Curated annotation (Swiss-Prot):
This is Cytoplasmic trehalase. Keywords: Cytoplasm, Glycosidase, Hydrolase. NCBIfam families: PRK13270.1, PRK13271.1. Belongs to the glycosyl hydrolase 37 family. Monomer. It catalyses: alpha,alpha-trehalose + H2O = alpha-D-glucose + beta-D-glucose. Substrate binds at R168, W175, D176, N212, R221, S222, Q223, R292, D293, E294, G324, E525. It comes from Salmonella schwarzengrund (strain CVM19633).
Length: 549
C-alpha cells in the first residue's frame, strides 16, 4: 500500500491508504497515446469569488478532521454550518488548541459554528387532508425567503424566494426545481414561479451557469440543463415571456459548449467531446477533482478502494452528482461497485436530449425576436446533435437509446434516461414506438417505471422509481401518440404515491416499485428524505390532469 497525503499541514499529516494497482483500460491507454484526450481545463475566471470559497477551502485540516472522524452522521452537516467569526480566526484557534489533552472537537465546532436549521422537519401533516391538500399546504413549509448572506456561509444568497426539496436539502437545486415548478403552476403559485425564474436567471448572470445548488461547494458543476424547459413553462403559464430569457439561454449554452471549437477528433474538454466523425456531444463534468465537501468521507473511502488515482475517482463522483443520477449503474464499469465509476467517459442520452432542447429553444425564441441568423445557426446545431445522437446513442438492434462510452467506443447500459428524447421531441415516431415496447418489457411495473433494470444497491437503479422519470415518460409517450402507455404510467405512479401517503401521511424522494406493495426506496449515500419537492410537483401536476387517485 502507498500512503498518499491529502493537504498535509505543518501540525499534522493526514494519510489515506491507496491501492498501488491502478485499474488500466487498454482502450483508454491506446487513445491517450494517439492524442491528449483530455487537456487540463483552465480555471474559470472570477470563480470562486472572495466569499464563495468552499468549506474545505476555508477550514483545511479542521474540515478534514471533522469529516474524517464522522463528527456528524451526515457529511453534509458541517459544510452547511455557518461560522460565528472570521474563518481564519477559527482556524488559528483550532491550530492552537487541538493538541491540548482536553481538546473536544465537538465542543469546539459548536462554540465556533451555527449548526444548520431543519425547518421542514418540524411540520406535522394532517392525516385528514387529501393528497392534493397535503401538497398545497406543504409549499409554504418548503419555501425559503431571501435573507442577508451570513458572512462566510456556504449558502449562496438569492434575490427571491425559492423552494427547497426538504429533509437534508435546505437549498434550491437546479433540475429538481423544474419538476417542483410543474406543481407550483398547478397550485396557482405564479408568485413562486416568478421568484424562481428570477433566481435562476440571476445565477446565470452572476456565475455564468446555474450551479448544482445555491451552495459554494456546488459552484464547480451544474446539473441537467433544464432552464429551457423552465422558460417554456413560464411562457405556457403566462408567468414570464420567453423572450426575456434569450440571453440567459445563450449564456448557459456557452457554459456547456466551452472549448468545443478547439477540440481535435477523439478529444474532450470539460463538458464537450469531439467524436471520431467530428460531431460534438456532451458529458457531465465538474471542474474540481477533490472529495465533495458534502460527501467527503464517502468519497475518500470510495477512492481508497478503487485502485485508481484518487483525483480521477473524485472527478467522476462529482460528475455523477452533476448528472442528477447519483449514483447509478449507468456510470459504473462494474455494476454494484461504486469505485468503478467512470462518469466522464460516458456520453449520456438525457444530457444530450436536454441540450437539443436548449438549442431548439434558442432557435425558436430568436425567430420570435426576428434574429434570423441566430435562429438558423441554432437550428443547425440542434439538427447536428440529433444526427450525432442517432449515430452513436440509438441502438437500432434493440430499439432504444443508450449512453455511449466514448473512450471504449461502445454503447453502455439501457435506462429510463432513454425517454428524455421523447420528452423534448427529438425522436421520430418509429423510435418512439420501438422504445415504448422496450420500456414496457424492461422498466414498467405496477408502481411506475424503474430507473434501470439492474439491482446494484445504488439509488438510481432497480427497484426505485423517481418522480421526474415518471413525468417525462408520461408526457414523452403521449407526445408521440401512445396515450395508453403514458396513462398507464401516470395511474401506476399516482397509486404508488397515494398508497404510501395514506399509510404514512408524507411524500418521499423515491419509491421501491419493483413488485409487491410500494414502499420507501433505498440505496444511496444518505437516509431517505421526505418533503419532497419534485415528488410534490409531479404528483400535483398529475392530479390536475387525472384527478385524485
Amino acid at each position: 500500500m502507498l500512503n498518499q497525503k491529502l493537504n498535509p499541514t505543518p501540525s499534522e499529516d493526514l494519510t489515506i491508504d491507496v491501492d498501488l494497482l491502478y485499474e488500466t483500460d487498454p482502450c483508454e491507454l491506446k487513445l491517450d497515446e494517439m492524442i491528449e484526450a483530455e487537456p487540463e481545463p483552465e480555471m474559470i475566471e472570477g470563480l470562486p469569488a472572495s466569499d464563495a470559497l468552499t468549506p474545505a477551502d476555508r477550514y483545511l485540516e479542521l474540515f478534514e478532521h471533522v469529516q474524517s472522524t464522522k463528527l456528524f452522521p451526515d457529511s453534509k452537516t458541517f459544510p452547511d454550518c455557518a461560522p460565528k467569526m472570521d474563518p481564519l480566526d477559527i482556524l488559528i484557534r483550532y491550530r492552537k488548541v487541538r493538541r491540548h489533552r482536553d481538546f473536544d472537537l465537538r465542543r469546539f465546532v459548536e462554540n465556533h459554528f451555527w449548526l444548520p436549521e431543519t425547518l421542514s422537519s418540524e411540520y406535522v401533516s394532517n392525516p385528514e387532508n387529501s393528497l392534493k391538500e397535503h401538497i398545497d399546504q406543504l409549499w409554504p413549509i418548503l419555501t425559503r425567503e431571501p435573507q442577508d448572506h451570513i458572512p462566510w456561509s456556504s449558502l449562496l444568497a438569492l434575490p427571491q424566494s425559492y423552494i427547497v426539496p426538504g429533509g437534508r436539502f435546505s437549498e434550491t437545486y437546479y433540475w429538481d426545481s423544474y419538476f417542483t415548478m410543474l406543481g407550483l403552476a398547478e397550485s396557482g403559485r405564479e408568485d413562486l414561479l416568478k421568484c424562481m425564474a428570477d433566481n435562476f436567471a440571476w445565477m446565470i448572470e452572476n456565475y455564468g451557469h446555474i450551479p448544482n445548488g445555491n451552495r459554494t461547494y456546488y459552484l464547480s458543476r451544474s446539473q441537467p440543463p433544464v432552464f429551457a424547459l423552465m422558460v417554456e413553462l413560464f411562457e405556457e403559464d403566462g408567468v414570464r415571456g420567453a423572450r426575456r430569457y434569450l440571453d440567459h439561454l445563450k449564456m448557459e449554452y456557452a457554459f456547456w459548449m466551452d472549448g468545443a471549437e478547439s477540440l481535435a477528433l477523439n478529444q474532450a474538454y470539460r463538458h464537450v467531446v469531439r467524436m471520431p466523425d467530428g460531431s460534438l456531444l456532451n458529458r457531465y463534468w465538474d471542474d474540481r477533482d477533490t472529495p465533495r465537501d458534502e460527501s467527503w468521507l464517502e468519497d475518500v473511502e470510495t477512492a481508497k478502494h478503487s485502485g485508481r488515482p484518487p483525483n480521477e475517482v473524485y472527478r467522476d463522483l462529482r460528475a455523477g452528482a452533476a448528472s442528477g443520477w447519483d449514483y447509478s449503474s449507468r456510470w459504473l464499469r462494474d455494476a454494484g461497485r461504486l469505485a468503478s465509476i467512470r462518469t466522464t467517459q460516458f456520453i449520456p442520452i438525457d444530457l444530450n436530449a436536454f441540450l437539443y432542447k436548449l438549442e431548439s429553444a434558442i432557435a425558436n425564441i430568436s425567430a420570435l425576436k426576428g434574429e434570423r441568423d441566430t435562429e438558423a445557426l441554432f437550428r443547425q446545431k440542434a439538427s447536428d446533435r440529433r444526427a450525432a445522437v442517432n449515430h452513436y446513442l440509438w441502438d437500432d438492434e434493440n430499439g432504444c437509446y443508450r449512453d455511449y462510452d466514448w473512450r471504449r467506443e461502445e454503447m453502455a447500459l439501457f435506462s429510463a434516461a432513454s425517454i428524455v428524447p421523447l420528452y423534448v421531441g427529438m425522436a421520430n415516431h418509429e423510435q418512439a414506438d420501438r422504445l415504448a415496447n422496450v420500456v414496457r418489457s424492461r422498466l414498467l411495473t405496477p408502481g411506475g417505471i424503474m430507473a434501470t433494470e439492474y439491482e446494484t444497491g445504488e439509488q438510481w437503479d432497480k427497484p426505485n422509481g423517481w418522480a421526474p422519470l415518471q413525468w417525462m415518460a408520461i408526457q414523452g409517450f403521449k407526445l408521440y401518440g401512445d396515450d395508453m402507455l403514458g396513462d398507464e404510467i401516470a395511474h401506476n405512479w399516482l397509486k404508488t404515491v397515494n398508497h404510501f401517503y395514506q399509510e404514512h401521511h408524507k411524500l418521499i424522494e423515491k419509491y421501491h416499485i419493483s413488485g409487491g406493495t410500494p414502499r420507501e426506496g433505498g440505496g444511496g449515500e444518505y437516509p431517505l428524505q421526505d418533503g419532497f419537492g419534485w415528488t410534490n410537483g409531479v404528483v400535483r401536476r398529475l392530479i390536475g390532469l387525472y384527478g385524485e387517485p
